[in-house]
Amino acid sequence: MSGKILDKMAGLLGLEDDLEEDLEEVEEETAEEEVTPLISSNTKRNNKVVSIHTAVSAKVKIIKPCSYEEAVDICDELKNRKIIIVNTTDLETKIAQRLLDFMGGASYALGGSLEEVEKSVYILAPSTVEVTNELKSQLISSKGIFNWNK
């Protein structure tokens, strides 16, 4: 009943026509808008196929430094994610120790690892490479590779 009274008053004041025109405009605007889906049906879903050929091959560099100044170059190679084998047999003991300290600090800072392969031969590996030395654990457990003294 109150709706009829309001309609009559709106008609008397001339507001009825404006109200109907506004409603028609809103209906036209909503009809003209196109609905775009958030997820298109053309896209691939959960593509979990990995190409075998995308694997990057690891590069190994063997270095036999002649001086301590080569430590920066060795660590730059480690920074570039290369595996480095360093042979320090030709260096004096003090210089080899300084070089080893520098390489150890750099490998720690870069998240890599430094392992002794043999006396005066070391391997530096980036954080993406895991180095295990099973030979060293065999030496410790059996007191030698070939246990001649039983």
Curated annotation (Swiss-Prot):
The compartments listed are:
Cytoplasm
Answer yes or no on keyword Cell division: yes
Q: Does the keyword Heme apply?
A: no
Give the UniProt record's GO annotations in the biological process aspect. division septum assembly; FtsZ-dependent cytokinesis
Assigned keywords, A-Z: Cell cycle, Cell division, Cytoplasm, Septation
InterPro entries (UniProt xref): Cell_div_SepF, Cell_div_SepF/SepF-rel, SepF-like_sf
Q: Specify where it is mainly localized.
A: cytoplasm
A Pfam family annotated for this UniProt entry: SepF
Which PANTHER family does the record associate with it? CELL DIVISION PROTEIN SEPF
Instruction: Describe its function.
Output: Cell division protein that is part of the divisome complex and is recruited early to the Z-ring. Probably stimulates Z-ring formation, perhaps through the cross-linking of FtsZ protofilaments. Its function overlaps with FtsA.
Subunit organization: Homodimer. Interacts with FtsZ.
Protein family:
Belongs to the SepF family.
**Which protein are we looking at?**
Cell division protein SepF
Q: Which organism is it from?
A: Clostridium botulinum (strain Hall / ATCC 3502 / NCTC 13319 / Type A)
Q: Which gene encodes it?
A: sepF
